[in-house]
Amino acid sequence: MATYQVRLINKKEDLDSTIEIDEDTTILEGAAENGIELPFSCHSGSCSSCVGKVVEGEVDQSDQIFLDDEQMSKGFALLCVTYPRSNCTIKTHQEPYLV
């Protein structure tokens, strides 16, 4: 099983942490396992509470049903159903910027 370095950043939240997450663990679960509290609601990819923005790297969010193609092309990802597929950097707490 592959493990990736995932950097979670957000200046307003004073967050800049790099954690290891297995390929079969969601970003949200991995953050929680490492003591990082991120916003969430449904845990099923059907709302936008946990949305983040992938700044660098690759992820798999094929289980999500909320974001449209344009939002995903801008890097938005629902962290409750997003799995790392490479080392990556993700801006957290992005729901206010999801238009």
Curated annotation (Swiss-Prot):
InterPro entries: 2Fe-2S_ferredoxin-like_sf (IPR036010), 2Fe-2S_ferredoxin-type (IPR001041), 2Fe2S_fd_BS (IPR006058), Beta-grasp_dom_sf (IPR012675), Fd_pln (IPR010241). This ferredoxin is expressed by heterocysts and differs from the ferredoxin expressed in vegetative cells. Keywords: 2Fe-2S, Electron transport, Heterocyst, Iron, Iron-sulfur, Metal-binding, Transport. SUPFAM superfamilies: 2Fe-2S ferredoxin-like. One of its GO terms (molecular function) is metal ion binding. One of its GO terms (biological process) is heterocyst development. Its cofactor is [2Fe-2S] cluster. Binds 1 [2Fe-2S] cluster. Residues 4-96 form the 2Fe-2S ferredoxin-type domain. Pfam families: Fer2. This is Ferredoxin, heterocyst. Signal peptide: none annotated. It comes from the Bacteria. [2Fe-2S] cluster binds at residues 42, 47, 50, 80. Belongs to the 2Fe2S plant-type ferredoxin family. Ferredoxins are iron-sulfur proteins that transfer electrons in a wide variety of metabolic reactions.
